[in-house]
Amino acid sequence: APAHIAAIRALVVAGRFDGGAITRVQDNYVVQWAARPGPGKMLTSGGAAAVAAGSTATPGGVAVGTGPGPAHPAILPAEYERPVKGLQITPLGSTDTYAPSGFADGWPVARDSKTGTAWLAHCYASVGVGRDNPPDTGDGSELYAVIGHGPRHLDRNITVVGRVIDGIADFSALPRGTGPLGFYKTPAEQTVITRVRFATAADPRYEVLASASPAFAAYLQARANRTGFFVRPAGATDLCNVQVPVRRVAK
């Protein structure tokens, strides 16, 4: 999703997330946060934030008004899927309810052989871009992270731009919103975002198990055929039940 990622990076450079807030925490679904409104914009109720979880816009929550402005781009292209050509996909090895699935470069992906396309799956810790009803695709000023069972029905409907590889437990531990769709009813309930910086500023180092490696293939088999405690191994696994191993390493 190069256009959406570029828009998010522009918002970070402009400091638009500094002073923003976590506006929504819906149990077994998503944590959502918003940048400060751009010049000439104002906080509104419901709106794009409500649609970030695949629901219709519902009053009661706090969202950020959208529209063009400095560091606030116009409607971006729909980046819900991409050509599968060029991707090295390690098959999941189990039947998936939604589409043939696997892993590419450490990312959970699904594909459609008829259209020749592939897309990032909505799994735990995935980060997506909130949007309003089509043709709106979101501008990157509202983002969410999945904190529950993978809402795969959102696949190819909302742009997935990344995933949380460190700190998702802090998101999951936030108090749930008591308003519709998990929005906080008042600004006092929200968690204020002090600042957002690129990871390169802190230079953390992480290693991800290569999904094209023999070790990853063995890992998939182990997830599908568990031993020890298990009396009856499932013999299969769900795409979102395979957490790609990530570890932080010393510099």
Question: What residue ranges belong to the model's regions?
Answer:
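Cyclophilin-like peptidyl-prolyl cis-trans isomerases
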Residues: A1-K251
